């Protein structure tokens, strides 16, 4: 099917649709009993990511259950440092961990074999495009260089990413080298996903919000702009969503300077400001995931507010970050029905 039949691709081209198409970040996840069952079969989390049979299954589960307008490849933003031999591991109750990198380690990093290492993920993309309904958009993704770098520097997640911020101040040249290497490798990875069958891709910058104004320009905007320019120079028709969580008022500059086709919004972005951003192009978001957990009027009012402010322009309805394990699957059903006008 051409892009004209896939609603999300139409919005990414600037079209306004009513009702808007929707998908949810982390829609394949622990809130679904069928996901938990497949996760138990797979073994480790990375085994789940790297085994196409399992990764395809968990990607398709929310499509079967809810009929979302997009399926997003089941993987993780940290597969790139894993491919760079940083010993990435996911421990229950601790989140992702890896061997922290220092200045010397950055100098010896090699990104040449990353895409080859991630062939199982690309096989998952190929199989998904074959198995998905023709009208369903297939989204690939990767992490933004800043967010991936924060984990590589600290070796784990931290509340405000202070280790990476400090490293960037003390070792500016090495840190810039790391960001640009990640930008180039990530662009190669996105091109490979597009070639394998992804209709569009999303860049996740989950920790953009901890950066000051100058650092946001240097660490969030510049590397992502480099990525997007690289992808589009090779695949001019590629559609790219960029999600810089916590970027706030800097999102207007972020859109202009990165060249993203659509901007993802977290739930803290005021809807009046979101409507201003929408005048420059498509937006995606931005329901608070806690409203999905709460259900009832909290869920209904959150949905209605977004549709009232953004529903007449190019909008992909989504959450402002990933759905949480505490979400009731029935609340997600109510969300889908209400966005589509059935509630």
From Swiss-Prot:
NCBIfam families: hemE. Belongs to the uroporphyrinogen decarboxylase family. InterPro entries: UROD/MetE-like_sf, Uroporphyrinogen_deCO2ase_HemE, Uroporphyrinogen_deCOase. Signal peptide: none annotated. GO terms for cellular component: cytosol. HAMAP family: URO_D. Homodimer. Coiled coil: none annotated. Pathway: Porphyrin-containing compound metabolism; protoporphyrin-IX biosynthesis; coproporphyrinogen-III from 5-aminolevulinate: step 4/4. This is Uroporphyrinogen decarboxylase. It is found in: Cytoplasm. PANTHER family: METHYLTETRAHYDROFOLATE:HOMOCYSTEINE METHYLTRANSFERASE RELATED (PTHR21091), UROPORPHYRINOGEN DECARBOXYLASE (PTHR21091:SF169). The keyword Cytoplasm applies. Keywords: Cytoplasm, Decarboxylase, Lyase, Porphyrin biosynthesis. It catalyses: uroporphyrinogen III + 4 H(+) = coproporphyrinogen III + 4 CO2. Substrate binds at residues 26-30, 76, 151, 206, 321. GO terms for molecular function: uroporphyrinogen decarboxylase activity. Catalyzes the decarboxylation of four acetate groups of uroporphyrinogen-III to yield coproporphyrinogen-III. Its EC number is 4.1.1.37.
